[in-house]
Amino acid sequence: MSTNVAKARVKSVLNESRQIERAAVLIRMGARMQVLESETTLSYERLIRLYKEIAGKSPSKGQLPFSTDWFLTWQENIHSSLFLNIYEYLSKGLDLDAVELLIRAYRLYDEQVTTTAIAPLLSFTRAWRLVKFVDAGMLTRTRCARCGGQFVTELYESRHFICGLCHPPARAGKSRVAGALMLH
């Protein structure tokens, strides 16, 4: 019987170690406390200590935004759509748990955006929230009638949807803000 107890302790120590490593990765990627609490089994107090140790500061306070609107505005939609397409592609080809899939997809999104010298508009926490909105059926992907790309839209978007790249808003591309797309 003592062998079973020893195995159980080893399993729990290994599991806790995995949870700490997962939380550390999420913190380094900029995840907010709500993400850490949702995606790990560590206590709130433990997460706070880990966050302070890794980030060197206390975590941001306050609620996460609970609105799909951010993902539907012009530039944010382009970034959200790029991330979600990467996420969906990886989910079909890799057998990973949801958090590992999110981490890999976000790293690829970040890599793609930064290689084009554009600042990523989509934070890791917003990417997590986007996946939650899609899983809850609040957002989906719709094919653009012109270019054929898949873009984040509300659930019942028109079949004749035209994306923000094919039909940008009138003032699009005029901003000099970091991360802004410049249209020529």
Swiss-Prot record:
Source organism superkingdom: Bacteria
Binding site for Zn(2+): C144, C147, C163, C166
Swiss-Prot/TrEMBL cofactor(s): Zn(2+)
GO molecular function, one term: zinc ion binding
Compartments, as annotated in UniProt: Cytoplasm
Keyword check for Nucleus: no
One Pfam family here: FlhC
The record's free-text note on cofactor binding: Binds 1 zinc ion per subunit.
Gene Ontology process terms (BP): bacterial-type flagellum organization; positive regulation of DNA-templated transcription; regulation of bacterial-type flagellum assembly
Family: Belongs to the FlhC family.
Function: Functions in complex with FlhD as a master transcriptional regulator that regulates transcription of several flagellar and non-flagellar operons by binding to their promoter region. Activates expression of class 2 flagellar genes, including fliA, which is a flagellum-specific sigma factor that turns on the class 3 genes. Also regulates genes whose products function in a variety of physiological pathways.
Quaternary structure and interacting proteins, as annotated: Heterohexamer composed of two FlhC and four FlhD subunits. Each FlhC binds a FlhD dimer, forming a heterotrimer, and a hexamer assembles by dimerization of two heterotrimers.
Protein name: Flagellar transcriptional regulator FlhC
Protein encoded by which gene: flhC
